[in-house]
């Protein structure tokens, strides 16, 4: 077993273990199916999570003061909003996985079958899989260390809440990892068909310059046309996968990236509070501060990985359009080959690739930079409010 197969298997079984995945598939055949034991296990575990949250919320516990000791009201609001959003997003993700189970199975079937049909994708995406796995594992590990550290400074009545918060974080992290893996496979497929498209164009150039023997020329043109039609078919499948991802992961993605945004603002404010008051005055230890900063670094680095792969998919799509633009130099080729080039070009123009969040926000570099600008502005506003009122 190679490294990427081992890592993908670990992600697959971990998703089943934590109750996020509620169906199974075979990496070797591409078959997606359900089993009684995995379905019952997911139902039991997810039901247990909801029941424990209901039980926990009936209690009256202020974990912010328990951890920070001298937290002011603004600290409590910031931490409560961030924690509450993470919990709601995690629970909503579990509900969506059951509500959209058939759609998820259909999406997984398309992705796994393309993965099986083109094994070179696995090799090309090796470093992307490894990088995401390492950063995700480190983030999970640091989150667990923070929970264990917090348990050492609070009463046992808070243990359940801390454990449930960690479980929600693990579920969200795994959900984003699954989405990232699909996007990574899509990007690798685009890179592969771009390489194939360049090869076809180079062969067409050579065909124009070589002496034309009618039988050989027609056979070669038909072969190139078949390759172009195969590229168009794969691109259409990738477009379908992207559209299905928007439908399946749209709401979850909006809540998750909204959480990243609010968490970034809150983290900037809490970092300012530590510098202003000192971690001792917030009843924090140096090890807790180091853990928190380390977790933030890998958490946001992991988020940047998720963002970068989406931007790179769009770059590969536009690169495909640029490569295809070179077809205008082909004059006098076989009619079928010319039509294959033209049909592929029309297919790309009529149905352009766009990555949106619930059709409200386009994921582009310009919008991303604008979002970072707003993040800095809102962080400054929150710090100014603290200066004026606390």
From Swiss-Prot:
Spans traversing the lipid bilayer: 5-25, 37-57, 76-96, 133-153, 166-186, 255-275, 289-309
Segments in the Cytoplasmic topological domain: 1-4, 58-75, 154-165, 276-288
Subcellular location: Cell membrane
Superkingdom field: Eukaryota
Cystine residue pairs: none
Family to which the UniProt record says this protein belongs: Belongs to the insect chemoreceptor superfamily. Gustatory receptor (GR) family. Gr22e subfamily.
UniProt function note: Probable gustatory receptor which mediates acceptance or avoidance behavior, depending on its substrates.
Name of the protein in its database record: Putative gustatory receptor 36c
Source organism of the structure: Drosophila melanogaster
